[in-house]
Amino acid sequence: EYQHAVSQECLSHLNEFRNAAIQNGVVSNIRSDHILWLRPEFQISHLHTQTLQQFSQALNRAFYLGIKEIEEHFACYHAGEFYALHRDNPKAKNGRMISSVYYLHEQWQADWGGELRLQDKNGQWHIIQPQPNRIVLFQSDLLHEVLISKQQRLSITAWLRSDTALV
């Protein structure tokens, strides 16, 4: 199964992950997860990239979004790690239009935390469980956070961009 294979690819590179940063650098009281930017030699996860490219083309045809690039990384939240309330594209400054999270871990229980908490355009909050093999897509300007995880939580986080990625 694809999800299992990409999970194994992620885990095989876990020693290469680095502390995730925000614009101001590594700030552990805002973000404590670890990431590894996807590289062309990651052949299994490259299929995820291709799927997002096809999805981007469909969005462009339907909504004229002008998506040109995909920026993505593996993300690992160890027990006790989180990402505080933020927007992936504050004030439409960085070209990120659609955010995507694809959950890679093999199993998940509701009491393990690690939920994505997301505020919609009407101000309503939604809690999304990080279920294995689930993909979540949302507008990058929406306020959201990752609640404290009690177990290792793995994902591919991606952004569909209207400009060239900065990494």
What are these regions (language model features)?
Residues 1-61:
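Non-heme Fe(II)/2-oxoglutarate
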Residues 73, 99-103:
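Short, hydrophobic/aromatic-rich beta-strand segments within well-structured domains
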